[in-house]
Amino acid sequence: MWIGVISLFPEMFKAITEFGVTGRAVKHNLLKVECWNPRNFTFDKHKTVDDRPYGGGPGMLMMVQPLRDAIHTAKAAAGEGAKVIYLSPQGRKLDQGGVTELAQNQKLILVCGRYEGIDERLIQTEIDEEWSIGDYVLTGGELPAMTLIDAVARFIPGVLGKQASAEEDSFADGLLDCPHYTRPEVLEGLTVPPVLMSGHHEEIRKWRLKQSLQRTWLRRPELLEGLALTDEQRKLLKEAQAEHNS
């Protein structure tokens, strides 16, 4: 997978390209991340990349010409088929379904805004989609872009040790993840649930599903509203609710 990034702070993306799972993906040529800095497309000695908004008001906007030229350069490097995404509080909120959609693309160009944002005409002419990571404001689009890259990269074949890891993560089936345990067997008086040490794989599967349903019901009940639960899931959820309320 190829991802191009337009950012005034490309150095920030070393966190993605040099560390952890995504760093290994880059090292093994499963993921390629290229960055373009709009400052490198300026023509004045100060490398100006911000400009005043028409109509006045606080703050500045990213200057059109350097940003536009950076986007065009990234598009040329990507070739055909690249989807251009602007990270914006006004965008569609990123969730696991959205991550799965974006992971189907082999080429993405991520535009990271700064200041008060970018000219609306650039959004109309250069941007394919706007995405947000939540209903709050950050100082720039770099952290949302890194979040998106990390989430999408998990679906690239070979990036995770087991592809099942991505398929069984929280939200992969619309539910929160179940609790997990490792050694020691007893920690400050708290023990590992016996079923997890039983060796009965079917019982372990049912326990994990039941815990996942219960955790979603207790912590994020709105997630259940849009799910078409199976007969087994409905049965296990009723059991979990009865146990919790008893």
Curated annotation (Swiss-Prot):
CDD domains xrefs: TrmD-like (cd18080)
Keywords in alphabetical order: Cytoplasm, Methyltransferase, S-adenosyl-L-methionine, Transferase, tRNA processing
SUPFAM superfamilies: alpha/beta knot (SSF75217)
One biological process term in Gene Ontology: tRNA N1-guanine methylation
Record's subunit section: Homodimer.
InterPro entries the record matches: Alpha/beta_knot_MTases (IPR029028), tRNA_m1G_MeTrfase_C_sf (IPR023148), tRNA_m1G_MeTrfase_TrmD (IPR002649), tRNA_m1G_MTases_N (IPR029026), tRNA_MeTrfase_TRMD/TRM10 (IPR016009)
UniProt-annotated binding residues for S-adenosyl-L-methionine: G113, I133, G134, D135, Y136, V137, L138
Gene Ontology CC, one term: cytosol
Top-rank taxon, per record: Bacteria
Enzymatic class: transferase
GO molecular function: tRNA (guanine(37)-N1)-methyltransferase activity
Catalytic reaction list: guanosine(37) in tRNA + S-adenosyl-L-methionine = N(1)-methylguanosine(37) in tRNA + S-adenosyl-L-homocysteine + H(+)
Location in the cell: Cytoplasm
EC number(s) from the headed UniProt entry: 2.1.1.228
Name assigned to this protein: tRNA (guanine-N(1)-)-methyltransferase
